[in-house]
């Protein structure tokens, strides 16, 4: 099997690091210059909805049960790896859409008096920023 590296093509540091990689590089991100990319990103019932494209065109649409742009990136990475392994998009869709997130990562505990209570153990400034950004958009 060929050596393959998957990286966030929207991240300039990842692209810089890839300059010295001799393996095949497959990119994912929000920009259409990536091998796998998302468009029409919008809030869904509980998380994010978006269309997934690759070099052949529209693969399909995904609806995550978890919010945040960072989770769109995570889903795109999953799609890229699974597609490379020749897993049909419908199988990828079923798996990705059934993922409910890690415990205590933007875990919705319920709604009380019109206020949604969320448990999140984010302990790093980058994680806290992603959590707050996701909360503002849901």
Which residue stretches match the model-derived regions?
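Acidic, Mg2+-coordinating active-site environments of NTP-dependent enzymes
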Residues: 1-117, 137
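AMP-binding/adenylate-forming catalytic core of the ANL superfamily
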Residues: 121-138
